Amino acid sequence: MTETAQMRTWAEISLDRLAHNYQTLRAMLAPDCRFLGLCKANAYGHGALQVGRKLEALGADMLAVACVDEAAELRRGGVTIPILCLGQTPPQLAELLLEHDVTQTVSDLETGRALARAAQAAGRTLKIHVKVDTGMTRLGFLWREGGERETAAAIAALCALPGLEAEGLFTHFARADEYDVSPAKTQLDRFLAFASLLEENGIHIPMKHCSNSAGLIRMQEANLDAVRAGITIYGVYPSQQVEKHIVELKPVMELKSHVSFVKKITKGTAVSYGGTFIAPKDMQLATIPVGYAD
């Protein structure tokens, strides 16, 4: 850190605390349950490469990112464990998925066909995880009551495409971090019933996962073949409604600064934009150099 930077604001990242959180969360899982550590968005601002390397060293089974560029950064930095891309990757970027050995989420048959063609043209096989939308209403093959067999047929067609290997099947909880977990349990029930329907029709996808951070902590029954741990790795609870006594997490990031200016103000003085703070008494006011760019 330069002398000038020391006079402003910085973040300190503790890989020891990251290790504590990983090990604490891992201890909640069955021995054969795989651990996917999320490194999207520069590892939630903590430094994707440093976090990815540490999670691999700790024994994480897989990492997950939002886009293929994030996966490529990890590969260039020496990460070797499997990486799942959770976002939608345009088929024209399929070469990057293959080049960096990235497993791709597929949410519709049309995209799957395009990725399969690209993989065949390269003489390669692309691993995929099939996403089922059971209630988040974002990416994923749409689950709808009465339409399960139609969706199952589309996924069967996807899994039969040469050039693709369907390694995983998953869904994402929308409300597992609320006091009332019944909406998440409804999603879990839909997913399990749909997975059974696929099996009954001869479609075997070996790795099934539902739990995000909140599900991992609060819904042990949802910790299937794997879990996807995101914000909890970094020591942050998914919401104020998640019971903190269940698991002790330690914040991985500390934001630090210096006091750059001190002044005395009198009772009733309005402070800063909009005057949103009114001094309740005569007091000293300290300013720290934290702004948009810090």
Task: Label each PLM-derived region with a short phrase.
Residues 1-103, 117, 125, 165:
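A charged N-terminal "starter" segment
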Residues 6, 41-58, 113, 117-118, ...:
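Active-site loop/helix belt of alpha/beta enzymes
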Residues 13, 107, 186:
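Residue-level signal for the nucleotide or nucleotide-sugar donor/cofactor binding architecture
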Residues 69, 87-91, 108-112, 132-134, ...:
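Short, acidic/turn-prone active-site loops that include or flank metal/cofactor-
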Residues 99, 105-106, 142-145:
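Structured catalytic cores of enzymes that bind and process phosphorylated ligands/cofactors
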Residues 252-294:
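Functionally critical, mid-to-C-terminal surface segments that flank or help form catalytic/ligand
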